[in-house]
């Protein structure tokens, strides 16, 4: 085969890709759970996120733009520090789009726990962008916004 001949087109299994993307999104959300194993769950983000990934918080505030480490560090302190207990995040509903080696999950999520003795809860939307790597699907970017006065999710 000459260097100019193309190899056979790859076969994409969209159902398997959707399942793998869903697994990555679930692992991302599951990382935000308080308790003794929270450092291990958060550490998994270091392989789930590309090293150059960007994470952006909007929430009606000045943008919070984080690289991987600046995103993980304060969450490690909060989730393992004891002031936030019984905390977890989970998806409510979402849509997965896949095309070749790129994918996106856009969906609603919820969170709840007890912070400094007071119940806390919220909902919002997350946009998760993923790319296929030799190691599997990895997150390249995340952005989120939470409900607040004037901005609410429909019943999920």
Which functions belong to the PLM regions below?
Residues 67, 116-119, 148-156:
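A short, polar/proline- and glycine-enriched secondary-structure boundary/capping micro-motif
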Residues 81-84, 111-121:
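Short, cysteine-centered beta-strand-loop-beta hairpins and adjacent loop/turn segments enriched
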Residues 91-96, 109-111, 125-131:
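Hydrophobic/aromatic beta-strand elements that line small-molecule binding cavities or substrate pockets
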């Amino acid at each position: 085969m000459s260097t100019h001949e193309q190899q056979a087109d790859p076969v994409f299994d969209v159902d398997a890709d959707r399942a793998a993307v869903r697994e990555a999104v679930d692992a991302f959300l599951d990382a935000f759970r308080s308790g003794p194993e929270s450092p291990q769950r958060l550490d998994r983000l270091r392989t789930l996120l590309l090293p150059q990934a960007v994470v952006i918080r909007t929430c009606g505030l000045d943008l919070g733009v984080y690289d991987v480490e600046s995103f993980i560090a304060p969450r490690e302190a909060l989730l393992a520090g004891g002031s936030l207990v019984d905390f977890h995040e989970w998806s409510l509903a979402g849509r997965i789009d896949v095309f070749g080696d790129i994918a996106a999950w856009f969906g609603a999520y919820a969170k709840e726990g007890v912070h400094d003795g007071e119940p806390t809860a919220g909902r919002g939307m997350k946009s998760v962008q993923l790319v296929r790597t030799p190691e599997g699907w990895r997150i390249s970017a995340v952005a989120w916004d939470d409900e607040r006065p004037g901005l609410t999710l429909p019943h999920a």
